[in-house]
């Protein structure tokens, strides 16, 4: 099967180029002007549209196994391809937790049957599974995930000797959720003394505070420098944390890297008034000054990748009474790319920089094989975008199993027209193909 995409504006490797792109089977076979391949092929006229590499989201929670009333790998990967996300790395805080090699392979087996996007997973670290982490083949999965602050699923790793042993012995990316547990507990106790469990939601960033984030991130970075570990700090949310990261060496040479999430680039603490607990995340959405600093650090390359931390809960769960009863997290994977393209429309970030942070850099950071770029011989994971097709996020166009979005009512100028996964048309003009084409991601390690 061949598909010829004609006259697209390719956004790739810091260039915009009008060209044709030929897909043969799973791969990009040719890129150039006025291609006329031999034999039968389908033609897509992409005049006036932009062709991007598929987005690689390095942090999602798809809730399977065990929490499938919220989401499944099938439902959320459908939403992903509708949003231009062709590869995801899923987190270990499912039920049961993904903390053994056996549980890890069980997840791969689920995804092999049901994932519409390419997939890999993180093996979770705990206070007592160091030997399991040592047995992990570096090529087997995305990396190891450590919760250095407690969050959904209660996978807190708080034994300092264990953390240092993991940093010293794990020979692949260690992705860390960094919030200082003692600081959070102290802050929570303070506000519970004032409000009981009816703590106003706008105090969430005071409980899961900037201080808690900085303490934990700085401690993890110091330990990574001491041990030589390959540390990737997830979801930076504060101005202070951005000062901990470098931009004076290429990403491929960095041992310590950072991710920022769409919601920390989009919302501020002012939005708690209108969105309430729907925008309760860990780490918390913080001040406008924090958001501005995150944008600056993203644009000057101290922050390396943009992701979602897609973390669905049911609307009933999010609308519960009582601060500690309300789970943190929200669905975003269907809207991460269009949200960033909206920022491009407003002149905040360039298309080239979006592709760098959402496509190229995750591939570099995780040593992903043959994905993340528009290159001959690479897998044809592609997104065709119309930059001028105004539409509104509404319940009826959501594909998340949970059926809600923190972005409902938001207008976007950019629209995903088509998404290709491994050369197959996975999404086209509002419809997801019924066949899941996702494959297990392989790594050059």
Predicted regions and their residues:
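Divalent metal-coordination and catalytic microenvironments
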Residues: 8, 21, 26, 48, ...
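Histidine/acidic residue-rich metal-binding segments in metalloenzymes
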Residues: 131-147, 152-306
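Metal-associated gating/positioning segment near the N- to mid-region
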Residues: 49-114
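Histidine-rich, glycine-flanked metal-binding segment
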Residues: 1-4, 9-53
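Short catalytic-loop micro-motif centered on adjacent basic/acidic residues
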Residues: 90, 120-123, 230-235
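His/Asp/Glu-enriched, well-ordered alpha-helical/loop segment
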Residues: 198-219, 223-228, 278, 299-300, ...
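Alpha-helix-loop-beta-strand connector modules within alpha/beta enzyme cores
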Residues: 101-117, 165-176, 335
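C-terminal cap of metal-dependent C-N hydrolases
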Residues: 322, 376-442
